């Protein structure tokens, strides 16, 4: 089994790459892909860059060049679930775009034309992630809706609007739904696993800078624990 692992920023993939055996690096279109072994599995780890376009490019290249059996998106996110604190983890139950609106043509808010309203992660990957939680000690993890858009959310007015549209949203970030959409197009199983770096409020920019490394490390540990369950 070969697993593709995608993170947007260096702190989100650094621990994974450092933990790999027999790493081999290839760069395509400015995106580095590191192949090797991690937790006894063949893996390819890539840092996609921030946002939906770069995430889509990286995912497509990963699938076309390496043909992974499944893809895990790891990294940080802003939290919306009251029971979660910075450093806690959200495992995707579904993934949606929060910044898409073609409702004029009868689609749901967040649904891209000719695409499903929500992208559903692979059941086996979600189950493996749930089992992996036990190995993380004090870190809390829940399963929930993760939403994606090309904006860093720290405006209370925008947060309120997003929660009106997606009242069950547990976390938001900037790559997951794009990765999920590409996986849907290629019929590749996926799961999104995010650790909270901030709480999507006025303090988010400060919290993000301070806690990104912590969130990235927690999410990476979760990915390694998940791989051990596969």
From Swiss-Prot:
Coiled coil: none annotated. Its EC number is 3.2.2.9. GO terms for cellular component: cytosol. It catalyses: S-adenosyl-L-homocysteine + H2O = S-(5-deoxy-D-ribos-5-yl)-L-homocysteine + adenine; S-methyl-5'-thioadenosine + H2O = 5-(methylsulfanyl)-D-ribose + adenine; 5'-deoxyadenosine + H2O = 5-deoxy-D-ribose + adenine. Gene3D superfamilies: Nucleoside phosphorylase domain. InterPro entries: MTA_SAH_Nsdase, Nucleoside_phosphorylase_d, Nucleoside_phosphorylase_sf. This is 5'-methylthioadenosine/S-adenosylhomocysteine nucleosidase. It comes from Shewanella sediminis (strain HAW-EB3).
